[in-house]
Structures are given as structure tokens and as C-alpha cells.
């Protein structure tokens, strides 16, 4: 009966209109404050279907990356809860992660945020048997600063200087697809970032290296880019810039501009239910 309820919930989640997910239902299991980094530093929350999955059926997994300008934010923010819950309702294991923020260490923290998020992918692969996931089917989604990080995970590889130095043998950080919610594509055209440890004028190279658009000419994992026209924090032109660079490179991507949507929306902004779009994209590349 519980499995039937899960199947019905998953099917219902694909159809609009549906009441916004604001609380975690009993059909979703959440494990909080899981250690995934060396030492007792950043932690993660795991969302998964509560219904038992047959041993032969491995779940796809998605890393969720919070925003906050690389200065603040948390894995347990409302947007991340909404995304994690909706993913679990649709048959995914979702891992909402924290990463090093500006001010937590002396000087610059970059590229620490990228490395932490890539280590989350490594942790999923290392623990795939215990988690019941397919290590070949891992995606990523993030909003704002998290969107920037999601795009970097999709676009960068071993030669780009973002790989953790302590990678286990036979384990890599590649993701199969990424969803970038209103992320910064070109840091040089945005504003100075505390995480970089210098201004754009003083060290333009670090800003260029931290910009997803820098890597758009490479072979990339498929990207879904979402941005609202009412965003006053990150100009929608940032997403258009990344989409154009990906188009010019012949990379698989989709740009969706949502009229009237502000910054920090989740999968269910009042302007449009984005679950069919986002879940459909993930299903195509991870199932």
C-alpha cells in the first residue's frame, strides 16, 4: 500500500495545478547532518523516498547546492527543502550540501566551494551501495551562488584545477546533468566577491577562472538554465550569456526565462510550476 501511495504521489507531482510543497510528507525520509567531508566540517541532508526500493533498482541521485553569495546560506533553507522533497517524491535520492563560506577561514575561500561540492559527488559514488543509488546517474541543481557551482560541476573536469587532491582511485567528480537556477555566469561582469579574497580589478584571473562561461566551449554535461525577469540580485543577462556561449559551442542546454519571477525561487514559484520542466529534464538524463 505504501508503495502504491508513493507511485500515486510521484505521478501527481508531475501534474499541475498542485498545492505547493511546504512541509515534508511522511512519504519522504530525511537524514540530517551527514558528514561527507574530511574532518568535522560541512554536512549534508539526505532526502529519499520512504518506500523501500527493490535491491535491484538503484535510485538516481542529485546534489542540491544552496545560494547566499558564497557568504551565507544553508542546506536546510526553504528552497533546498522544497527541491529535496520534490526530488524524493519523484524517485530520487537528493543530497543537500553545505560548503565553505567566506569568513569561515582567513583570506580567500575560493575554490573551496567548488571542491566541497565535487567531494559531495565523490561521497555519493563511494557510498553508492549503502545508499542504494546508481553511481553513474548523478546530477546537480543549485540556486544563485549554488547555480554557479552547479554549472561549474557540469562544465569543469580534471584539467581545470577544481578536482579534489585526495580523490580515491577510480572515482571521479563528473555529473550527468545540471540545473542552474539564476546563477552567475561571468563573475567579471557581476561584482566583487569576498570568497575570492581580492577585487576584480586586483585579480581578474581568479574571477575569470571562477566563471562558468569560461568553460562553455568544452564538452559539457547537459544544462537546464532557469531565470526570472524580476530578478534584482543576478541580472537575467547572466543566464542568457551562458546559454549563448553553450549554443556557440554546440553544447546541450536549455534556457527558460520565467516572466515576473524574482530571485531565490524554488520549483514552485507562483509564476509557474517548474516541477514538470525540472523533473522531466532530470528524468531524461538520469533515468
Language model regions located:
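N-terminal cap/lid segment of alpha/beta-hydrolase-fold proteins
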Residues: 16-56
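Mobile cap/lid helix-loop segments that gate and shape the active-site cleft of serine hydrolases
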Residues: 20-26, 39, 159, 167, ...
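C-terminal catalytic histidine-bearing segment of alpha/beta-hydrolase fold enzymes
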Residues: 45, 107, 236-287
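Short substrate-entry loop that stabilizes the transition state in hydrolases
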Residues: 52-59, 65-106, 148, 188
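Primarily recognizes the serine-hydrolase "nucleophile elbow" in alpha/beta-hydrolase
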Residues: 119-192
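Acidic catalytic loop of the alpha/beta-hydrolase fold
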Residues: 186-187, 230-234, 264
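Short beta-strand/loop motif that positions the catalytic acidic residue
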Residues: 219, 225-227, 231
